[in-house]
Amino acid sequence: MATEKTYPMTQEGKEKLENELEQLKTVRRKEVVERIKIARSFGDLSENSEYDAAKDEQAFVEGRITQLENMIRNAVIIEDTGEESTVVTLGKTVTFKELPDGDEEAYTIVGSAEADPFEGRISNDSPIAKSLLGKQIGEKVVIQTPGGEMQVEIISVK
């Protein structure tokens, strides 16, 4: 039997997924069922775009519910000790400077389930995170990105 994929995430990330799941089950699911009922009342389902759209949305909502239930069931919580560290690990915020004289950037490395690059949270599967994980403050690291290679120096890990 194949083992199920685990989803590393913070407690905060798990709670966000649980809230989204609750919203989908209690609100969105009911809204979609109501849209399907209304669309059915329009008659002929073979050329009923409202019905087709509502059924598509229902499939999306049910798929997302299944996905969230699986992620929550297989969540592995990353403990945040709140302490500074010298080593980059999952759940830590790492600040680095692009060399030779670039700007400083900071990212929190999280599991893919809660990654949001616009909020400074990158997936542990991303090229940047893969290059930084396990490295220490002061180390110079070469990162392979889709845009090319960049060299950075790790400034802090929190």
From Swiss-Prot:
This is Transcription elongation factor GreA. It comes from the Bacteria. Residues 3-75 form a coiled coil. The keyword Transport does not apply. HAMAP family: GreA_GreB (MF_00105). GO terms for biological process: DNA-templated transcription elongation; regulation of DNA-templated transcription elongation. The lineage of its organism: Bacteria, Bacillati, Bacillota, Bacilli, Bacillales. InterPro entries: GreA/GreB_C_sf, TF_GreA/GreB_CS, Tscrpt_elong_fac_GreA, Tscrpt_elong_fac_GreA/B, Tscrpt_elong_fac_GreA/B_C, Tscrpt_elong_fac_GreA/B_fam, Tscrpt_elong_fac_GreA/B_N, Tscrpt_elong_fac_GreA/B_N_sf. It comes from Bacillus cytotoxicus (strain DSM 22905 / CIP 110041 / 391-98 / NVH 391-98). PROSITE patterns: GREAB_1 (PS00829), GREAB_2 (PS00830). GO terms for molecular function: DNA binding; RNA polymerase binding.
